[in-house]
């Protein structure tokens, strides 16, 4: 019985800190993931725009010659 009471006491002291850390880390990690995804999408859209511009230039060059 002595072990059980020590375990319950430990978990009851530990649980609020665990919850607090979890509540702090969850939004931070979500923000990090979202910003990384936004950065990747911006890079992809810039690359796509660059490819479209070079393709249009190539087509214009073929038409002009």
Curated annotation (Swiss-Prot):
GO terms for biological process: monoatomic ion transmembrane transport; symbiont-mediated activation of host apoptosis. The chain crosses the membrane at residues 21-44. Disulfide bonds: none annotated. Residues 45-65 are virion surface. The record marks 22 as: Involved in opening and closing mechanism of the pentameric structure. Four species of SH have been detected in infected cell cytoplasm: a 7.5 kDa non-glycosylated form (SH0), a 13-15 kDa form that contains one or two N-linked carbohydrate side chains of the high-mannose type (SHg), a 21-30 kDa polylactosaminoglycan-modified form of the protein (SHp), and the isoform generated by alternative translational initiation. Of these different forms, SH0 is by far the most abundant protein detected during virus infection. InterPro entries: SHP. One of its GO terms (cellular component) is virion membrane. Channel activity is inhibited by copper. Also inhibited by small-molecule pyronin B. Residues 6-15 are annotated as: Interaction with host BCAP31. It is found in: Virion membrane; Host cell membrane; Host Golgi apparatus membrane; Host endoplasmic reticulum membrane. The keyword S-adenosyl-L-methionine does not apply. Its main location: virion. Glycans are attached at residue 52. Homopentamer forming a funnel-like pore. Interacts with glycoprotein G; this interaction occurs on the surface of virion particles and infected cells. Interacts with host BCAP31 (via C-terminus); this interaction is direct. This is Small hydrophobic protein. It comes from Human respiratory syncytial virus B (strain 18537). The gene is SH.
């Amino acid at each position: 019985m002595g072990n059980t009471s020590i375990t319950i006491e430990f978990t009851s002291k530990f649980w609020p800190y665990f919850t607090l850390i979890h509540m702090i880390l969850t939004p931070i990690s979500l923000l990090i993931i979202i910003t990384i995804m936004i950065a990747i999408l911006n890079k992809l859209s810039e690359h796509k725009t660059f490819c479209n511009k070079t393709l249009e230039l190539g087509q214009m060059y073929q038409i002009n010659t």
